């Protein structure tokens, strides 16, 4: 029998969108992406640099619970 999968789906949220006032953003809201990570290789929270359409620039996106 196959083992339980080690890959889980995680949500990444922009860290800068919350601190910027809505007058400086293109639209109201927070940028979020979904991706998969391997639980065995990456035990800590995932951080990736992704494009934030709200701020129209590349920002750090952190894994949220």
UniProtKB/Swiss-Prot annotation:
Region described as Disordered: spans on this chain: 17-40
InterPro entries according to UniProt: Ribosomal_bL33, Ribosomal_bL33_CS, Ribosomal_bL33_sf, Ribosomal_zn-bd
Cellular compartments per GO CC: cytoplasm; ribonucleoprotein complex; ribosome
One GO BP: translation
Any GO MF annotation of the entry: structural constituent of ribosome
One matching Pfam family: Ribosomal_L33
Swiss-Prot/TrEMBL keywords: Ribonucleoprotein, Ribosomal protein
Similarity remark: Belongs to the bacterial ribosomal protein bL33 family.
Name this protein carries in UniProt: Large ribosomal subunit protein bL33
Organism from which the protein derives: Prochlorococcus marinus (strain NATL1A)
Record lineage: Bacteria, Bacillati, Cyanobacteriota, Cyanophyceae, Synechococcales
